[in-house]
């Protein structure tokens, strides 16, 4: 990901304030509500029948936290995203057969959730930096597909 030193510092500073459980659960929940076809990868999660069920589902929240923790690893290794996500790329490609477009969708949902959580602190400049980061992470996760 091509970020200036200032952009990297801003991304890291915000990330240090992120509550992985809250933001991760909300981001994954929103992905499953807004793009319902993504639910097919989460059959074992129980009731995903309506937005309230999805957003209140403890398995969605737990997996969202796990997803966001992995994303945080990427935030701390922006110069080696492909290496950081190599094993997850292989898992999602070879075993889970996840459409790589879903990584882009989740990244965009994450940006929405960060904006909601951080309000005016999530400036347009910071959003631009995070859009670069989520695009880089999505590309790294899709790497095994190429």
UniProtKB/Swiss-Prot annotation:
A biological process (GO) of this protein is:
hydrogen peroxide catabolic process
Q: Which residues carry this modification: N-acetylvaline?
A: 1
Q: Which residues carry this modification: S-nitrosocysteine?
A: 93
Give GO cellular component annotations, separated by semicolons: haptoglobin-hemoglobin complex; hemoglobin complex
Instruction: Give the record's keywords alphabetically.
Output: Acetylation, Heme, Iron, Metal-binding, Oxygen transport, Phosphoprotein, S-nitrosylation, Transport
Membrane among keywords: no
Q: Which residues carry this modification: N6-acetyllysine?
A: 59, 82, 144
Its tissue distribution reads: Red blood cells.
Quaternary arrangement and interactors, per the entry? Heterotetramer of two alpha chains and two beta chains.
Which family is this protein grouped under?
Belongs to the globin family.
List the protein's name. Answer: Hemoglobin subunit beta
Q: Which organism is it from?
A: Equus caballus
């Amino acid at each position: 990901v091509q970020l200036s030193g200032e952009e990297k510092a801003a991304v890291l500073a915000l990330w240090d304030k992120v509550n992985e459980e809250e933001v991760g659960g909300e981001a994954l929940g929103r992905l499953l509500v807004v793009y319902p076809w993504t639910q097919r990868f989460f059959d074992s999660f129980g009731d995903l029948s309506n937005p309230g069920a999805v957003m209140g589902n403890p398995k969605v929240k737990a997996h969202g936290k796990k997803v966001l923790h992995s994303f945080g690893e990427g935030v701390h290794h922006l110069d080696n995203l492909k290496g950081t996500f190599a094993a997850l790329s292989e898992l999602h490609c070879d075993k889970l057969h996840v459409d790589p477009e879903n990584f882009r969708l989740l990244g965009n949902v994450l940006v929405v959730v960060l904006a909601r959580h951080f309000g005016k602190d999530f400036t347009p400049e910071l959003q631009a930096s995070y859009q670069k980061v989520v695009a880089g992470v999505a590309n790294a996760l899709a790497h095994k597909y190429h």
